[in-house]
Amino acid sequence: MTTGSALYIPPYKADDQDVVVELNNRFGPDAFTAQATRTGMPVLWVARAKLVEVLTFLRNLPKPYVMLYDLHGVDERLRTKRQGLPSGADFTVFYHLLSIERNSDVMIKVALSESDLSVPTVTGIWPNASWYEREVWDMFGIDFPGHPHLTRIMMPPTWEGHPLRKDFPARATEFDPFSLNLAKQQLEEEAARFRPEDWGMKRSGTNEDYMFLNLGPNHPSAHGAFRIILQLDGEEIVDCVPDIGYHHRGAEKMAERQSWHSFIPYTDRIDYLGGVMNNLPYVLSVEKLAGIKVPDRVDTIRIMMAEFFRITSHLLFLGTYIQDVGAMTPVFFTFTDRQRAYKVIEAITGFRLHPAWYRIGGVAHDLPNGWERLVKEFIDWMPKRLDEYQKAALDNSILKGRTIGVAAYNTKEALEWGVTGAGLRSTGCDFDLRKARPYSGYENFEFEVPLAANGDAYDRCIVRVEEMRQSLKIIEQCMRNMPAGPYKADHPLTTPPPKERTLQHIETLITHFLQVSWGPVMPANESFQMIEATKGINSYYLTSDGGTMSYRTRIRTPSFPHLQQIPSVIKGEMVADLIAYLGSIDFVMADVDR
């Protein structure tokens, strides 16, 4: 199934004000305060007392905002450029909503005072609000009355304080030296003990006693430091509780202590298999703040390298997924093919997994001599390899038996849980940002959006394999139609600046020195950019207070909601089905935990 048989999605229109008119007609214009931003969507402040009513209205419109795309907070207490903020806004909770049928977004914000950090839960409107609200409580200490289980999610249960508050230290040197004596070790071990009653689970049923099984956090099929506790009746999964946070490194906190430029390498480590794909939403969002329009050559280079990393990520997924269901050989072949891709990536960027190669206003350097030959060798090689994987593995009756009909969900369920990427398109929903909301010039390329219909573990795999074929088509078009021109924008905030801007007189040299050492000064505003990353939609929501560092960096990753969905999908299936399901999600814990 391809784009021709799917639901019509209208052309994207940034800052679409239709929903603002509908809200004003329903609640009156005095109920909202608009904030001018560079996020590309309406941003509206609403009183806390009206919040649930407003969000319910948006969820139930004729063309509803079916997805709670993101929910998080901001500590506004140290913000100096407060234009657009309500008076007394010490903290903000924001709700980013997405409508497929409108192909538009809206952001609703609530201002909170430090003395009253509480906002009603919206888990009754969107089930995926649960983990987001837990993270906001964990990071900021904001309470959500009515939440079914408001506990730590990123930090350990014994942690003290809320790390994303501005008064919480950002460097290890600001803490006392860490020590772990026997008593503290026993305390931590006891805190990690799973108690079924805490999660509303019974230890026994009418005629049976349930077994509780820890899968992870170091199980090979958990794909990283991920723990999931299973409530079992024999081999059948009665219920389960995913437990995340073991890979949390405080990436959003780090962004507050790095310059706009020096944070780029940290983005590589979010989805550590995505390479420059991680750089892209960040630099695009910074460029919105700066007002930078990059040359066509930069756009095309960025697209080509992003699609290379889509292929390398999908190849690793394919090999490990097939290995999870019992076939041991294909993973060695997929890793060999990844090496061929990395040969090209390393020749162009100088690095393999984590190039940190995109720059604010361009890329680190121009394409090397002979790059076309390397790219052509790869795109000539890969199609026949994908054909072999199809015949040898994906058409295999055992693999089909293990995955067809397993862990299936439909489009409605996917949207309610915030599922994006191949997981959403495997249900038949044709929503790929490269087509629906083109960025970086994707509208100039010819490619199809692979779809499936059943939303099961097999379809998720098939969609990704077809996506690799489409990525090869895009790379070939980049190779054949690479524009001439500079690899950096001629803009004062391009970082590092073009050398021509530095060699005019002493002032330009000083400007260059300050911009490289301290970092560029970005205008005070807010910006946002989402992209179709390897594992789904990835986005950066940046807040600048007019300085050399981000005031707040919100990183929304696709894998976080994908893991939250697990219990709703896998209940009633077997443990072996869970292994196939986990493999079909395609996640890494760095992408979940940040």
UniProtKB/Swiss-Prot annotation:
Biological classification of the source: Bacteria, Pseudomonadati, Pseudomonadota, Gammaproteobacteria, Pseudomonadales
GO MF terms, alphabetically ordered: NAD binding; NADH dehydrogenase (ubiquinone) activity; NADH:ubiquinone reductase (non-electrogenic) activity; quinone binding
Gene: nuoC
Subunit comment: NDH-1 is composed of 13 different subunits. Subunits NuoB, CD, E, F, and G constitute the peripheral sector of the complex.
Name of this protein: NADH-quinone oxidoreductase subunit C/D
Compartmental location: Cell inner membrane
Record membrane topology: Peripheral membrane protein
Catalytic activities: a quinone + NADH + 5 H(+)(in) = a quinol + NAD(+) + 4 H(+)(out)
One Pfam family per UniProt: Complex1_49kDa
Keyword annotations: Cell inner membrane, Cell membrane, Membrane, Multifunctional enzyme, NAD, Quinone, Translocase, Transport, Ubiquinone
Family to which this protein belongs: In the N-terminal section; belongs to the complex I 30 kDa subunit family. In the C-terminal section; belongs to the complex I 49 kDa subunit family.
InterPro entries: NADH_DH_suC (IPR010218), NADH_DH_suCD (IPR023062), NADH_Q_OxRdtase_suD (IPR001135), NADH_quin_OxRdtase_su_C/D-like (IPR037232), NADH_UbQ_OxRdtase_30kDa_su (IPR001268), NADH_UbQ_OxRdtase_49kDa_CS (IPR014029), NDH1_su_D/H (IPR022885), NiFe-Hase_large (IPR029014)
EC number: 7.1.1.-
Protein's organism: Pseudomonas fluorescens (strain SBW25)
Keyword DNA-binding tagged: no
Keyword Cell inner membrane: yes
Function per UniProt: NDH-1 shuttles electrons from NADH, via FMN and iron-sulfur (Fe-S) centers, to quinones in the respiratory chain. The immediate electron acceptor for the enzyme in this species is believed to be ubiquinone. Couples the redox reaction to proton translocation (for every two electrons transferred, four hydrogen ions are translocated across the cytoplasmic membrane), and thus conserves the redox energy in a proton gradient.
Alphabetical list of NCBIfam families matching this protein: NuoC_fam, NuoD, PRK06075.1, PRK11742.1
